[in-house]
Amino acid sequence: MVATVKDEHPTSEIDYNKIRSSREEMMRRFKEAHDKAKAEGTITYKRIKFKSSNEPLYGVLCG
């Protein structure tokens, strides 16, 4: 019989609770910033114009 020792924090196991909590924190901070900007009236909207019909969308959003 071989005894195996389980690691305290295995590297292959994904910590979903940590991911979920950090996502919720990020969303909460964004909502706070959005509400603050909305109250101050500093949110501006800009139309996205495509230069050509075959231009990829990610190029417009990231570029």
Curated annotation (Swiss-Prot):
InterPro entries: DUF5486. It comes from Enterobacteria phage T4 (Bacteriophage T4). The lineage of its organism: Viruses, Duplodnaviria, Heunggongvirae, Uroviricota, Caudoviricetes. This is Uncharacterized 7.3 kDa protein in mobB-Gp55 intergenic region. Pfam families: DUF5486.
